[in-house]
Design a protein with these regions (language model features):
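Small-residue helix-packing and pore-constriction motifs in hydrophobic alpha-helices
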Residues: 1-44, 53-64, 73-84, 94-176
Length: 177
């Protein structure tokens, strides 16, 4: 128990350094990072996802240029979406890595989407939520595609680059509850 507690503390300290380095340009301070990690730790205690996975993922998301508060909310939403689809902690970790790369690039492409579907996350519920958000944000119209076309061929529609980082971020924040 003592070693486990120390290991978690050590992980938290390393994560704080990484997150501060990734978010310094946003004016993020130690108190803000610590509060976000505490929130995720409390959340992790209530789910099958451990604090180590959460801190690794927040590091990935902040490295993609996302502010720490937004990243913490998105990680909770991602974990909720993973849990709702029955995704394992290991599957979610791999998908989170791929998603962080896509968020950094600004667009979720088919290969990124497949990383979600391969672990069971890219289901109809997620697709519907993303389509509704993209439609409300005007992203579909801006990319000359309709919600009906996306619903008809979700995977093929991703070639139109309508699934932006902003759409996915909004979806994950909503899923955070």
């Amino acid at each position: 128990p003592v070693n486990a507690g120390f290991a978690e503390y050590e992980l938290k300290m390393g994560s704080i350094q990484t997150i501060l380095a990734n978010t310094a340009r946003h004016g993020t301070g130690l108190d803000q990072v610590t509060a976000s990690l505490e929130e995720l730790n409390t959340y992790a205690d209530k789910t099958i996802y451990n604090f180590g996975d959460m801190t690794k993922n927040i590091g990935l998301f902040t490295n993609a240029g996302i502010k720490v508060d937004d990243a913490a909310s998105m990680i909770k939403g991602f974990s909720n979406a993973a849990a709702a689809s029955g995704t394992s902690a290991q599957g979610a970790a791999g998908a989170a890595y791929q998603l962080s790369q896509a968020l950094s690039a600004g667009t979720i492409r088919l290969m990124d989407w497949r990383s979600l579907t391969n672990v069971g996350m890219g289901n109809k519920n997620m697709q519907t939520g993303l389509i509704e958000i993209a439609d409300a944000m005007g992203t579909l119209e801006a990319n000359t595609i309709t919600a009906e076309e996306v619903q008809g061929d979700f995977n093929g529609s991703l070639e139109k680059n309508w699934l932006s980082a902003d759409v996915m971020s909004s979806y994950l924040k909503i899923m955070a509850g």
